[in-house]
């Protein structure tokens, strides 16, 4: 029900597991979406998840974007997809030392992305790099740590954009905090505006087009 209401607006979808792909197929079978909808496929990808992503692309879904969490995933997708397809790369953030759950094993390191693109993606016959995925596990907060990681991401984007003009999207993950007490005070509008402003300003200074 929630998805059906959301789909009345111009939205994209995001998946994080093989089960979510089944939901996408069900929405299509019931006429709730068409094959042009953008679906960003995040999360660690089991073979089942990768196979279901490949099935969507092979069956004519035109805007499926699997986000690579590791080097293996592109090899698996290449083996099972018969058409051209878009991909994204998750940037492995350098996490705060005190964070309880270590998740930066997911993604490709800042320093490795340009070499990986040059060696594996630039001349790939079918894959096209479209998106960078920037995820901070502590969420979107007005802290020096958050802004520092965002600017690292933007430096990678700017360098990539100069050699890979097809890269045109930035997916910002981590989520906003939610109200958990009466004292909760978070300026959502300020943070959204500041993130967009900093991205636009950085790209103007670097002489590259800002991302979607």
Predicted segments, located by residue:
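Active-site-proximal beta-alpha core segment in soluble small-molecule metabolic enzymes
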Residues: 1-169, 198
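Glycine-rich beta-strand-to-loop/alpha-helix junction loops that act as flexible
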Residues: 137, 170-179
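Alpha-helix-loop-beta-strand connector modules within alpha/beta enzyme cores
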Residues: 153, 191-204
């Amino acid at each position: 029900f929630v998805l059906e209401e959301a789909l009345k607006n111009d939205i994209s979808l995001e998946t994080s597991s093989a089960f979510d792909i089944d939901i996408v197929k069900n929405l299509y079978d019931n006429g709730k979406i068409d094959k042009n909808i953008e679906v960003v496929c995040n999360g660690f990808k089991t073979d089942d998840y990768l196979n279901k992503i490949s099935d969507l692309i092979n069956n004519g879904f035109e805007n499926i974007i699997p986000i690579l969490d590791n080097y293996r995933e592109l090899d698996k997708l290449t083996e099972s997809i018969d058409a051209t397809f878009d991909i994204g790369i998750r940037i492995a953030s350098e996490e705060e030392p005190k964070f309880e759950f270590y998740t930066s094993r997911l993604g490709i390191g800042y320093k490795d992305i340009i070499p990986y693109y040059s060696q594996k993606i630039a001349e790939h016959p079918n894959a096209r790099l479209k998106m960078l995925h920037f995820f901070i596990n502590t969420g979107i907060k007005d802290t020096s740590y958050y802004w520092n990681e965002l600017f690292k991401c933007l430096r990678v984007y700017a360098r990539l954009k100069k050699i890979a003009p097809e890269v045109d999207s930035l997916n910002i993950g981590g989520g906003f905090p939610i109200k958990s007490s009466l004292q909760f005070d978070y300026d959502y509008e300020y943070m959204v505006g500041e993130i967009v402003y900093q991205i636009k300003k950085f790209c103007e200074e670097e002489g590259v087009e800002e991302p979607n």
